[in-house]
């Protein structure tokens, strides 16, 4: 699979580039169409908040879909990542307006941790960001990127 960022929604456990932030914007309350800034500190491995910004200003990624994991016992990060990959990749084309495999954007996601799961967090947050990790200056919705 192409490079990806995997984070968790209450305490972010990250693979790839980190997704931590220091604003008062809760990771658990993201909305489709929100644009976010990734932290300057690339060594960060946890997050409970994300810096949100206007999509017309420089930003690192955009929320393009939300999904929910089924209730029950915590399924583990591997199972949640499989679900997130399926959900996010299937929603990518319709939101961005281009095929995921040929897009200049990558799909990344945030998933619940065991701790956030215990607080009823079932959110899977799908993010689009440039493959080269450059900044975006507009929404990726129907952009064809």
Question: What residue spans do the PLM features occupy?
Answer:
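Primary mode marks residue(s) on the alpha4-beta5-alpha5 output face of response regulator receiver
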Residues: 3-7, 22-145
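Bacterial Sec-type N-terminal signal peptides, specifically the leucine/valine-rich hydrophobic h-region
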Residues: 16-19
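Repetitive helical segments and hydrophobic/amphipathic motifs
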Residues: 11-13
């Amino acid at each position: 699979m192409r490079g990806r960022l995997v984070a968790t929604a209450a305490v972010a456990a990250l693979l790839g580039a980190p997704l931590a932030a220091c604003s008062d914007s809760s990771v658990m309350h993201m909305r489709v169409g929100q644009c976010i800034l990734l932290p300057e500190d690339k060594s960060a491995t946890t997050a409970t908040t994300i810096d949100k910004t206007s999509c017309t200003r420089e930003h690192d990624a955009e929320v393009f879909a939300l999904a929910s994991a089924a209730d029950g016992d915590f399924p583990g990060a591997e199972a949640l990542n499989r679900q997130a990959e399926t959900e996010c990749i299937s929603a990518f084309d319709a939101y961005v307006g281009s095929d995921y495999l040929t897009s200049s954007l990558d799909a990344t996601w945030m998933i619940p941790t065991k701790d956030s799961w215990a607080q009823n967090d079932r959110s899977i947050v799908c993010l689009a960001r440039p493959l080269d990790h450059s900044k975006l200056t507009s929404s990726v919705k129907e952009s064809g990127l």
